[in-house]
Amino acid sequence: MKEIIGNLLKKENVRQNLSSLRQEIKDENALAEALKLLAGEDELLVSFMGAEDAKTRKNAALLIGDLHMSQLSDEVFKAYEAEQMRFVKGSYLAALSQLDCKELLPQLMERAKELEHMTVTAENRKHI
């Protein structure tokens, strides 16, 4: 795990390392270790949600959720609002579902109202 996080800190093979770290932290002890190793690196994880590669953005958001980093809930929501790729949007919501984001409830409710008035195809429903 130290190697994976070291690679992330060096911004090497980011998409693959985010995915690998997500697999590693399924174990509770590994989750605690990852949180220690990533202490103070909130900005790094947030920066990955702004990556050019859509799968990197997706994995970054999901990792933040997996790590239960509620202090980043505002950043995850901002990234959700800015995201253009539909298949990534759902990952931001999945991440938010694992975070304490009560303060975002008014914005989430507003977004839900907007979506109610949109015409959504069956193919796109899972991405919203």
Name the predicted role of every residue range.
Residues 31-32, 63:
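Short, motif-level signal for alpha-helix interfacial/capping segments enriched in acidic residues
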Residues 25-26, 37-38, 64-68, 96, ...:
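Alpha-solenoid repeat junctions
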Residues 1-18, 35-50, 69-82, 101-115:
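Amphipathic alpha-helical scaffolding segments comprising HEAT/armadillo-like alpha-solenoid repeats
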Residues 54-91:
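Charged low-complexity stretches with an acidic bias
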Residues 10, 23, 53, 85, ...:
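Helix-start/N-cap signature of alpha-helical segments
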Residues 14, 27-31, 57, 88-89, ...:
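Residue-level detector of extended alpha-helical repeat arrays and alpha-solenoid scaffolds
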